[in-house]
Regions:
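Active-site palm subdomain of RNA-directed nucleic acid polymerases
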Residues: 193-228
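Short acidic-aromatic active-site loops that bind/stabilize oxyanions
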Residues: 183, 187-191, 195
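Conserved two-metal-ion catalytic palm core of "right-hand" nucleic acid polymerases
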Residues: 1-185
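Short, well-ordered loop/turn elements at secondary-structure boundaries
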Residues: 122-126, 188, 218-221, 227-229
């Protein structure tokens, strides 16, 4: 029979090396994977635009990856080796095709803590605060994507309309039992979904801190680095 629009993901647990706690990850149903591919094809440039607004983010999609694969060594001249691979922005990322998008600025969190940027911030500021959004993906309300893209008032006016944000919302629901509370952890598209929402929060934070009673200026009084792992 015809496959339901909403699907059930395959869940499994992983444990970090040396850690005690496990974490639930999920694989999307193949039907939803195909729907995600169609969504990328239709909206990739808009997704890139929405992920380019935050001054805080240190891991975000920056451009479409070119589908160029490394050929067999026996067929490659040494001087051409660097041309026969997918386009990557960080030389340390492996040469295999990993993602539809290329990323800036750090693909792994530890690289930020060993970077010149981190050293500069240490020298500039006397205090460091670290924050974590616990179980972030599991608690994301999918309708929030509309608020992030269009604003809460306009989003209400566009409920049920065929818009990018409503399509993205529906896609994430269909990947996870048709639930609006939480998105699955693991797929790249989930991180992009969260990044769009958090970029809007980043901008709201900057604007709020400019106002009284804070009157704080980004780059002078404080700086923020945010990362989705």
């Amino acid at each position: 029979g015809k496959l339901k629009k909403w699907t059930i993901p395959f869940d499994y647990s992983v444990r970090k090396y040396g850690g005690d706690k496990s974490r639930k990850l999920s694989l999307m149903h193949p039907y939803i994977q195909v729907e995600c591919a169609k969504f990328y094809e239709s909206h990739d440039y808009y997704m890139l635009s929405l992920c380019s607004n935050s001054p805080f983010s240190i891991r975000y999609i920056s451009e479409r990856t070119k589908c160029i694969f490394k050929v067999e060594e026996s067929e490659t001249k040494e001087e051409e080796e660097n041309l026969n691979r997918i386009e990557i922005l960080d030389e340390e990322v492996d040469k295999l095709y990993r993602s539809y998008f290329s990323y800036k600025r750090y693909d792994m969190m530890y690289k930020f803590f060993t970077s010149g940027d981190y050293l500069r911030l240490e020298q500039k500021y006397s205090h460091l605060m670290k924050m974590d959004i616990a179980r972030c993906f599991y608690h994301i309300y999918t309708h929030t994507i509309a608020w992030a893209v269009k604003g809460k008032e306009q989003a209400k006016e566009l409920i049920g309309k065929e818009t990018f944000e409503n399509a993205f919302d529906t896609l994430m629901q269909h990947a996870n039992y048709n639930e609006t509370n939480g998105i699955i952890v693991g797929p790249e598209i989930s991180r992009i979904f969260a990044e769009v929402i958090l970029q809007r929060i980043d901008i709201n934070v900057v604007n709020r801190l400019k106002q009284s009673p804070y009157s704080l200026t980004l780059g002078r009084d404080y700086e923020v680095r945010r990362y989705i792992d």
